[in-house]
Amino acid sequence: GGIDVIVTSPLRRARQTADAVARATGAPLLADDGLIETDFGKWEGMTIAEVSQRWPDQVSAWMRSVDVAPPGGESFADVISRVNAALDRLLAEHQFRTLLLVSHVSPIKIAACRAMLAPPATLFRIQLDVASLCEIGWFADGPAVVRSLNDTAHLSRAGR
């Protein structure tokens, strides 16, 4: 089957993608704040190289622990709690339906780690490219399976 419901982060970069998919599929579109990207605080909009130059000790600590937050931002532990609450709610509300979640790197990594029962620090070991796809099957009795992660095959097809 096709997509039953599209759920997007309300941030513009996700919303634009979700709007395009909704137009193409006719699926209803919902926004969920739980799917918003990590708030990187003072690091927002900077590259990791720029951040590392200005805050070397904080970056080092942040890259070692999900409990460390960027200055003025959210820790990954906080994001994990927020994303898991959104996933719990969405899975309960949309059982037996096919959802397309349009989100950002951190929430997608968190969903994949949850599906694989992987520890939180696994977030630091997953690479996700822009506009990549991740497919996760969630089952009513609890377990989940990651069917694909960081799939970018559609991007090369789109460029032809």
Predicted regions span which residues?
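Active-site signature of alpha/beta-hydrolase-fold catalytic machinery across serine-
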Residues: 20, 110-114
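Short beta-strand scaffold positions
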Residues: 8-9, 81, 102-103
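Acidic, low-complexity terminal tails and accessory targeting/binding regions
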Residues: 1-2, 38-50, 92-98, 113-160
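Generic structural signal for well-ordered alpha-helical scaffold segments
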Residues: 80, 84-92, 112
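Phosphate-coordination/substrate-recognition cap region in phosphate-metabolizing enzymes
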Residues: 1-59
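Short glycine/proline- and acidic residue-enriched helix-loop micro-motifs
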Residues: 58-78
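Beta-strand elements within well-structured catalytic alpha/beta cores of enzymes
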Residues: 97-103, 107
